[in-house]
C-alpha cells in the first residue's frame, strides 16, 4: 500500500477515537449499579466494556462478562437507570483526544467530506458532539440506532458512502477497535486505527488495519484528496 492514500471522504468513530468518554460512561454505570444494590466497578473494567453500544455496556456491567446475559427483569430495570444516569454525566469529564480538533480542521481544509459513525445511540451522540463543539464538522452522523445494523456490520459505512455518492474504496474509516476494522474490511474501505482508544481491552496492534496513527491529525498526513 502506498501513501498518501487517495480518499474522498473520512468517517470517524466517536468513543475512544474522537472523545475519551470512558470516565462519564463509567460514572453512569456505577450510579446504575449503586441503585441496583450492586458493587461499583473500576474505570479500567468499564472501559473494556465500551464499544458495542449502551445495552451491551449495561449487560457487561451487570454480569462482569464481555458476553454476559443478565436476567431479563434485571436488564429491564437497569436500562432506564443507566440512560437517566448517563444523561446527567454525558459531558462532565469527557474530553477530545489530542490532535482531534487539529485533524478535523485539516480534513475540512483539505476538502474531505466527513461523517461520524458510532455505535452510540443518537439520543446521546448528537448532544455529546454538540457539547464538545464537534458536531458542525460533520456532514452526516450515523448513530448506533440510525439503521437496522451497526458496526462491525458494514451497513453504517455503506450508508454513509451512499449519502456521499462515493464508492467504499474512496472512503477511510478512523477508529479504535475491532468493530471499526471489521466494518471497514467488510465494506471494502480503508481503515486507520488509533492506539489510545478502548478496543474492549484488546491490543490495537493486532487489528487488520492499513495504519496505526498516533492521532487524527497524524492520519491526515497519510491521505490526499482524490478527484
Curated annotation (Swiss-Prot):
Catalytic activity as recorded in UniProt: 2-phosphoglycolate + H2O = glycolate + phosphate
Active-site residues from the entry: 13
EC number: 3.1.3.18
Amino-acid positions noted as binding Mg(2+) in the UniProt annotation, renumbered to this chain: 13, 15, 176
Lineage top rank: taxon: Bacteria
Protein role: Specifically catalyzes the dephosphorylation of 2-phosphoglycolate. Is involved in the dissimilation of the intracellular 2-phosphoglycolate formed during the DNA repair of 3'-phosphoglycolate ends, a major class of DNA lesions induced by oxidative stress.
Name assigned to this protein: Phosphoglycolate phosphatase
Amino acid at each position: 500500500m502506498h501513501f498518501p492514500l487517495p480518499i474522498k471522504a473520512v468517517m470517524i468513530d466517536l468513543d475512544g477515537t474522537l472523545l475519551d468518554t470512558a470516565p462519564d460512561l463509567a460514572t453512569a454505570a456505577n450510579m446504575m449499579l449503586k441503585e441496583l444494590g450492586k458493587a461499583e466497578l473500576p474505570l479500567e473494567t468499564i472501559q473494556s466494556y465500551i464499544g458495542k453500544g449502551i445495552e451491551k455496556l449495561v449487560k457487561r456491567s451487570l454480569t462482569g462478562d464481555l458476553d454476559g446475559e443478565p436476567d431479563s427483569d434485571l436488564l429491564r430495570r437497569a436500562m432506564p437507570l443507566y440512560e437517566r444516569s448517563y444523561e446527567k454525566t454525558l459531558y462532565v469529564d469527557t474530553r477530545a483526544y489530542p490532535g482531534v480538533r487539529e485533524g478535523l480542521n485539516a480534513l475540512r481544509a483539505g476538502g474531505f467530506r466527513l461523517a461520524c459513525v458510532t455505535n452510540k445511540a443518537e439520543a446521546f451522540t448528537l448532544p455529546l458532539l454538540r457539547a464538545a463543539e464537534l458536531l458542525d464538522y460533520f456532514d452526516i452522523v450515523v448513530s448506533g440506532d440510525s439503521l437496522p445494523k451497526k458496526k462491525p456490520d458494514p451497513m453504517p459505512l455503506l450508508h454513509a458512502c451512499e449519502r456521499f455518492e462515493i464508492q467504499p474504496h474512496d472512503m477511510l474509516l478512523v477508529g479504535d477497535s475491532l468493530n471499526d476494522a471489521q466494518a471497514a474490511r467488510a465494506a471494502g474501505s480503508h481503515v486507520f486505527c488509533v492506539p489510545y482508544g478502548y478496543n474492549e481491552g484488546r491490543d490495537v496492534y493486532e487489528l487488520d488495519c492499513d495504519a496505526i496513527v498516533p492521532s487524527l491529525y497524524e492520519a491526515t498526513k497519510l491521505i490526499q484528496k482524490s478527484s
